[in-house]
Amino acid sequence: MRTVTVGTRGSALALAQTRWVVARLKEEWPDTDFRIQTISTKGDRDRAALQSLAQKGDKGFWVKEIEDALLAGRIDIAVHSLKDLPTEQPEGLEIASIPKRVDARDVLIGKDGMKRLEDLPSGARVGTSSVRRKAFLRAYRPDLQILDLRGNIDTRLAALGTPDYDAIVLAAAGLIRTEMRHRIDEFIDPDLLLPAPGQGALALETRADDDLSIEVVYAIHDHATDDRVTAEREFLAGLGAGCMAPVGAHATLKDGVLTLEGWVGALDGSQVIRATTSGDPAECADLGAELAADMLGQGAQQLIEAAHR
């Protein structure tokens, strides 16, 4: 029996994602022994420094140590949340498989009487860790108090038990993967709040010359998800932005047409830019790049740079 080592961060969400991946791979390769190895990243060790790291252009704080282990041959496959992965991979590595996306949307969880974004009273205190969500909420509901809230899912949910927060906004996928879907009060429609590029999708990364591992992970590759997230990530790359920028993107496929929406907002909520394009899914990368160019022409770069000052 051959052994394949799968690397991941050690958080509850990362482990839940990786166990899901391993279960799918085991269905395809029953004679293979998959072993999970947890790896601590810079983002895990120093969450307080994330904003300053982003300002310095460091885009690999959730993945670098895992990619180093992959390059060194200590692991064979890396499992990442796609939205945390920089748009360019280190030389010698590639995204070899993208499984079917779970749910790209953001969700709201609130105290009694505050279960929907529309129901939040003026002055309600809303916690989130994402600059994208902060920018959106300040633009959409300038009457709310938008507060920083970091930590894992359990930490954020526990914050609702304190007087400091009336509601929190976070990604649906994390709650679904950790079997806490029942805690969700409202799924926020992407027509209102565009998710982060790649949100809800996973990336399985391998060494580019490791044909065996590439074959193993490609067995659970989902082409439709790949087309959608490729458009979203090319949009992000075209803007020259990273995962901590106030940027949203969401691609949909219907009747053979891929539609991509992009959003960039000022962190204080004073300005937003939103645009849409559509075309052949086979041209998903070009669609993302074209939409980025369109929005750069409308001043998107200035909003992104201002958010990192």
Swiss-Prot record:
Disulfide bonds: none
Associated pathway: Porphyrin-containing compound metabolism; protoporphyrin-IX biosynthesis; coproporphyrinogen-III from 5-aminolevulinate: step 2/4
Chain positions with S-(dipyrrolylmethanemethyl)cysteine modification: C243
Cofactor(s) of this protein: dipyrromethane
GO molecular function: hydroxymethylbilane synthase activity
Cofactor binding annotation: Binds 1 dipyrromethane group covalently.
Its EC number(s): 2.5.1.61
Catalytic activity field: 4 porphobilinogen + H2O = hydroxymethylbilane + 4 NH4(+)
Cellular component GO terms held in the UniProt record: cytoplasm
Keywords in alphabetical order: Porphyrin biosynthesis, Transferase
Functional note: Tetrapolymerization of the monopyrrole PBG into the hydroxymethylbilane pre-uroporphyrinogen in several discrete steps.
Quaternary organization: Monomer.
UniProt-listed HAMAP family: Porphobil_deam (MF_00260)
Extra facts: The porphobilinogen subunits are added to the dipyrromethane group.
Family membership noted in the UniProt record: Belongs to the HMBS family.
Listed name of the protein: Porphobilinogen deaminase
Source lineage: Bacteria, Thermotogati, Deinococcota, Deinococci, Deinococcales
Annotated gene: hemC
